[in-house]
């Protein structure tokens, strides 16, 4: 039983290191990003394939809020280069607060809104099974 678990663990680790897929010759694909313009919800953005010269994904979020109201406008697109660095600009005018968040990234669909499963715990979640099997084999 222990040798079988060891083989299973080794195959899972090798799959993790290769990105979970077999290594084959695959033709190069263009970058894909989410695209939308001044929508109120990130769920209204849809994935598109960028042109060959577009190498980054850009997202802008404009947030206006008061003590009783909140309005967000989201825009996302492909771009040839980052228009500016990632930044957050905040200001206030009377009782209205405003924030513009600009982000630029270079991975496929990297400009999506983070879901509840993403962020800090996403990498440990992907490694949990191989690490758990490794610990199990060690205890045998």
Swiss-Prot record:
Provide this UniProt record's keywords sorted from A to Z. Answer: Cell membrane, Disulfide bond, Glycoprotein, GPI-anchor, Lipoprotein, Membrane, Signal
Residue ranges of the propeptide: 117-140
Please give the superkingdom of this protein's source. Answer: Eukaryota
Please name every pair of cysteines joined by a disulfide bond in this record.
33-50, 105-110
In this chain the UPAR/Ly6 domain maps to: 31-124
How does the record say this protein sits in the membrane? Lipid-anchor; GPI-anchor
Lipid-attached positions, GPI-anchor amidated serine: 116
An example Gene Ontology CC term for this record: side of membrane
Which segment of the chain is annotated as a signal peptide?
1-20
Gene3D superfamilies per the UniProt record, alphabetical:
CD59 (2.10.60.10)
Query: What protein name is recorded for this chain?
Result: Lymphocyte antigen 6L
> Transmembrane region positions?
none
Q: Where in the cell is it found?
A: Cell membrane
Tell me which SUPFAM superfamilies the record gives: Snake toxin-like
